[in-house]
Regions:
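Intrinsically disordered, low-complexity linkers and terminal regions
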Residues: 117-124, 130
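ATP-dependent carboxylate/acyl-activation modules
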Residues: 1-101, 109-112, 126-133
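Structured adenosyl-cofactor binding patch, chiefly the S-adenosyl-L-methionine
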Residues: 106-120
Length: 133
């Protein structure tokens, strides 16, 4: 799972979710600022380079996306600077182009990850579409 969580509020909002994934044994990757935050709060996160940093490096996020190293990408925009928008766009576009699930909202990401980590298949009752109407 790769996190690029943007502003401090988003980092805090995603902390419990990233802890859950880490506790379940998932490998956590994150862009530099997010990785530093997660590591400082007990989540072992491997830093990855932004798209415009060291493009040929093994741990450049775009190379890792192309190599399908992530099963989920959580990318929360931080600000509207040209660099931030371009890098964020490239990550989101790469996720879509390589069929990697992408979440761009911190609250939605937290809810999804909590459900993913806490619910078992036996907890979910499968119904036909008509039963939901």
């Amino acid at each position: 799972v790769m996190f690029s969580s943007g502003a401090m509020k988003s980092k805090v909002d995603l902390l419990d979710a990233s802890r859950m994934l880490f506790a379940k044994g998932y490998q956590i990757y994150a862009t530099a600022g997010t990785a530093a935050f997660l590591n400082a709060h007990g989540v072992d996160a491997t830093p990855v380079y932004w798209p415009d940093e060291k493009p040929g490096a093994e741990n450049n996020v775009m190379k890792m996306i192309a190599d399908h190293k992530f099963d989920l990408i959580v990318n929360i925009p931080k600000n509207h600077s040209k660099r931030e928008l371009t890098n964020g766009y490239r990550i989101r576009r790469g996720a879509i182009d390589h069929n990697i699930p992408l979440i761009t909202n911190a609250r939605l990401a937290s809810a999804f990850i909590e459900a993913f980590c806490e619910l078992k298949l036996s907890d979910i009752q499968i119904k036909s579409w008509q039963e939901y109407k």
